[in-house]
Design a protein with these regions (language model features):
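Beta-propeller blade termini and top-face loops
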Residues: 1-186
């Protein structure tokens, strides 16, 4: 619960009664958006908390230690029920795999991953899609390529606009406008 008196609570009777385990504010950042709790399928004392960062408890949720991951804004976690050392973490940067219980993670730089909030097409031929990405820049991507695939070298940054809106000037497809949270216009 994200509140002044919030925390992590546990019920062992289907919600009839609750015990407050922790009031650590670090583990409850933006709970309405992405805080999720995961229990190890083989050890009930191991609890994972995902929010901005990843947190791990080995004492049933009373204390937590931060776990380093390749990217922030962690949204989801899959724990292999037969081998809890094997996990997949979904975050704003993509997906990261661990084979050692979160001690290390695979890179996010080996996969074309983007989380787009807004897109717009321009009048260029062939048309290009302009988009604002979560935790990254605004980008312009061609709709096709003569190289057999659309490569990153075919794409262009068109400003910085995490999750803001984007528009392309109708009479000049080389000009785009993007809005960054906080009212900054690029």
């Amino acid at each position: 619960v994200e509140a002044e008196e919030g925390g992590l609570f546990r019920s062992d009777d289907g919600g009839e009664t609750w015990e407050k385990l922790s009031d650590n504010a670090d583990i409850r950042g933006r709970p309405w958006y992405f805080t999720h709790i995961f229990a190890d399928p083989q050890n009930p004392d191991i609890i994972w908390d995902l929010c901005y960062n990843v947190w791990k408890s080995i004492d049933g949720g009373r204390t937590f230690a931060q776990v380093t991951t390749p990217h922030g804004d962690n949204h989801d976690l899959w724990i292999d029920p037969r081998n809890p050392q094997r996990m997949i973490n979904g975050n704003d940067g993509g997906a990261c795999v661990s084979y050692n219980g979160g001690a290390s993670w695979s890179s996010i730089y080996n996969q074309p991953t983007a989380e787009f909030y807004h897109v717009a097409a321009d009048n260029h031929y062939p048309y290009r899609v302009h988009g604002t990405q979560q935790d990254s820049s605004a980008i312009r991507v061609p709709s096709r390529s003569y190289k057999g695939a659309i490569l990153m070298s075919d794409c262009d940054p068109v400003g910085f606009s995490e999750s803001g809106d984007i528009a392309v000037k109708p009479d000049d497809p080389e000009i785009s406008y993007s809005v960054y949270p906080g009212g900054i216009i690029n």
